[in-house]
Amino acid sequence: MTTRLFGTDGLRGQVNIYPMVPDMALRLGLAAGTFFRNGNKRHRVVIGKDTRLSGYVFEMALTSGLCAAGMDVFLVGPLPTPAVAFLTRNMRADLGVVISASHNPFHDNGIKFFDKDGFKLPDSQEDAITEMVLNQNHRWDYPEPERVGRAHKIQDAPGRYIVYLKNSFPSTLTLDGMKVVLDCANGANYRVAPLALEELGAEVIRIGTSPDGLNINHKCGSLYPELAAQRVRETGADIGLALDGDADRLIVVDEKGTVLDGDQIMAICAMDMMEKGRLPENRLVATVMSNMALEVFMKERGGSLLRTPVGDRHVVEAMRRTGAAMGGEQSGHLVFMEYGTTGDGLLAALQLLRIMREKNRPLSELAGLLTPFPQQLINVHVQRKIPFEQCPEIGRAVEQAEKELAGRGRVLLRYSGTESVARVMVEGEDDALVGRLAAGLAETLQQHLR
């Protein structure tokens, strides 16, 4: 069986520690270029990155490998992950590559691939690439010297993405008179997001738009929405938008400074789409982490919630399989299949702003559609990731917690696909009970997974 090199969101790790080393990036470029090369036509790949200092290292290594494999490389510089997915389709490329570790600190980085249609690669293709990369005896099928690829910088890539975003917003509407607090996490959207909102007429109050290579996600962005909330209260803004480092997720703050997560944003957007007949079979796709209240919300309105494993990749796969138009994660990955192929924080923000404009209602009123059940999420750092069912003590603790919830709540244990972390999630009707059970389960995991 092929060793899994890729997690739920590509390859990720600490810079200059295996596997996030330049040699790995070079071999990944060679392998991906070889795998996607087909026939004698010129092959093209789009490479984008976020604002991490190490992005230059992996950009150059990947470019070398891809060019050596016969791919022409289009370098678009710091741009959001969804922008690279869009540009891969828009530029008729064979492959898209993003260099980013998303919401992680600057000392981490990652590499993920998109196919020609802008979708993340399936396991089978990632495994084929992995097999070439890890086989030190693999004989590379290098092209003839005249078929070696060229590298080009694409200067107008940000402008193309802005036009794409604005085309998702009705031409009959503007954001004139709206005050928007925008936190770009010193990440990939630091240039594009403010410009797109300002071109639509909004007054933008900027946070996290001065990247220095080291400050990406540092006490800002979607993991620190209280920063945007404070600025909303100070300035009287209509809304706060907090993006993560690669801008594929969104957390929102209403005009009162209340933080809204992905579940609440999905409820608002799903309701709007159901009213307009734009949500096929009134089906919404979300992960096992989404609050039970979202499931109840959809059922009460004649709809349904289809749950998937964690990761926007799994959400998108389920959407494609079922024909769903919208899906997302509580963490803020939101996918609108009419417009894009992956989570896009700014595109999701524009959909929310459109609804606010069309209904002429403040965000706090719209958010009243969904009242989340009490939920507690605890991250437990682990030394090993053994299957939970192989530890009887963990099984007994889960069984006891479910017994106390008496069918009026959920317990979920899972490992992170990108970090050495086990996640404990408990939700139910009683806040105190939920907190106590979550803390007890976290302690059990700490004892048995060290």
Curated annotation (Swiss-Prot):
GO terms for biological process: carbohydrate metabolic process; peptidoglycan biosynthetic process; UDP-N-acetylglucosamine biosynthetic process. Binds 1 Mg(2+) ion per subunit. It comes from the Bacteria. Signal peptide: none annotated. Catalyzes the conversion of glucosamine-6-phosphate to glucosamine-1-phosphate. The modification Phosphoserine is found at S102. Activated by phosphorylation. The keyword Phosphoprotein applies. This is Phosphoglucosamine mutase. It catalyses: alpha-D-glucosamine 1-phosphate = D-glucosamine 6-phosphate. InterPro entries: A-D-PHexomutase_a/b/a-I (IPR005844), A-D-PHexomutase_a/b/a-I/II/III (IPR016055), A-D-PHexomutase_a/b/a-II (IPR005845), A-D-PHexomutase_a/b/a-III (IPR005846), A-D-PHexomutase_C (IPR005843), A-D-PHexomutase_C_sf (IPR036900), A-D-PHexomutase_CS (IPR016066), Alpha-D-phosphohexomutase_SF (IPR005841). Belongs to the phosphohexose mutase family. It comes from Oleidesulfovibrio alaskensis (strain ATCC BAA-1058 / DSM 17464 / G20). Gene3D superfamilies: Alpha-D-Glucose-1,6-Bisphosphate, subunit A, domain 3, Alpha-D-phosphohexomutase, C-terminal domain. Mg(2+) binds at S102, D244, D246, D248. The lineage of its organism: Bacteria, Pseudomonadati, Thermodesulfobacteriota, Desulfovibrionia, Desulfovibrionales. Its EC number is 5.4.2.10. Keywords: Isomerase, Magnesium, Metal-binding, Phosphoprotein. NCBIfam families: glmM (TIGR01455), PRK10887.1 (NF008139). Its cofactor is Mg(2+). CDD domains: GlmM. The active site is at S102 (phosphoserine intermediate). GO terms for molecular function: magnesium ion binding; phosphoglucosamine mutase activity; phosphomannomutase activity. One of its GO terms (cellular component) is cytosol.
